[in-house]
Amino acid sequence: GGGGGTRYGGGGGAGGYRESKCSTTSGCWTASPRATCVSLSLVPGAVPVTVGAGGAGSATQASGGNATLGTQGSTSTFSTISSAGGGGGSSENVNPGQPTVRNGGAGGSGGGASYNGCGPGTTAQGGAGNTPSVSPAQGFAGGNGGPTSGYGSGGGGGATAVGTNGSTPNVTGVGGAGATNT
């Protein structure tokens, strides 16, 4: 997953979720809504697997410092299948000479946005999910930042749902739901 933002920061997005289940070949479990029926042929021998690391949270800001995004998580791979790391959550910008709002970062699922510090008519946008694009989608967008007076930031996106938007008073959005296999 992606790292979260600091100082009214948005939540980090979940890493991309990929799943395959073909009822005639895949066993007796219930697949999530994200499953596809595309098989991957494997031959005996080594299969390259990389487990991507989670992203670091954004750095704490000094007085007058610029905002930073949480770091995007690293890509995970199994053979030829890749799942993107989650997008980083955004942070409020405490530099008075700069805009005080940041958008969430894109990724497997998008990072949530910081609250709307730029005044009426502007909204910090949650980061895009399913980046890079695959079908079915590997994740969803992060939530938008809340209104100026609310200090509510967006939740990070999940495997099966978007993160919810921040709202007033001081309500941070909930992260998007994950996927369940049974």
Segments predicted by a language model, with ranges:
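Glycine-biased low-complexity/repetitive sequence motifs
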Residues: G1-T182
